[in-house]
Amino acid sequence: MNAINHAATALLINKKWPGVPIIPVLLAVQLVEFLWVAFNLLGVEVTTTEPQVRALNDIHLAYMPYSHSIAATVVLALTVWVVVAKFLDKPTWGLALAVAVSSHIVLDLATHVHDIALAPGIESPKFGSGLYGVPLLALFVETLYGVWCWRVFQGSKALLAVIVLFNLGALPFYAPSIPGPVYLLAGHPKIFAAIIGVHIIFGLVAVGFFARSQWRSSASEAPQGAPADRPKVAGR
């Protein structure tokens, strides 16, 4: 899924768990992708390209069991929950951040071709909806999702514009008929990974900047019945 729409998922997390600060939530929704970038640059995971790259379906996420397998994401989310909920004694934060981490693989399963493994060491079967086999439809669906996140969050028009413009900016990557610099990525998967890393950062910064004034930073703003972390009382 386009990085800006993963970033937009943070808006849903804030709507459900408003007591969690903006930066940890933004980092959590893209933690899986940060690992993917690092593992590709280090050669631990492998991305390949067709001799000519015209759109995203000419780039193949050939081997990514450590960052993008279902089991690896579950372990990563549980680790985040244990560290935050148990060691830092912030159970609501831990739950929110674990859900944020898990959201990444859920959204990728909804859009990717069959390139997501069940677990490291299990190469088959691989999972994905296959939506990226029809790139323009994928971009349309992704953009709708980003706009829906904005609507649930009740964000500003500037935030909406950021989400829409980031998606439109990716149009050459989703539409082979629209000229763009994507052809330069042929045979250069590590450059592709580095570009994705930069794109992630820009997306997170943009969403964070334009959402910050409406970010629900007080647990008192949580929906009725939602748990909130409270400071411990001495002697209890």
List PLM regions with ranges:
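N-terminal membrane-targeting hydrophobic helices
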Residues: 1-236
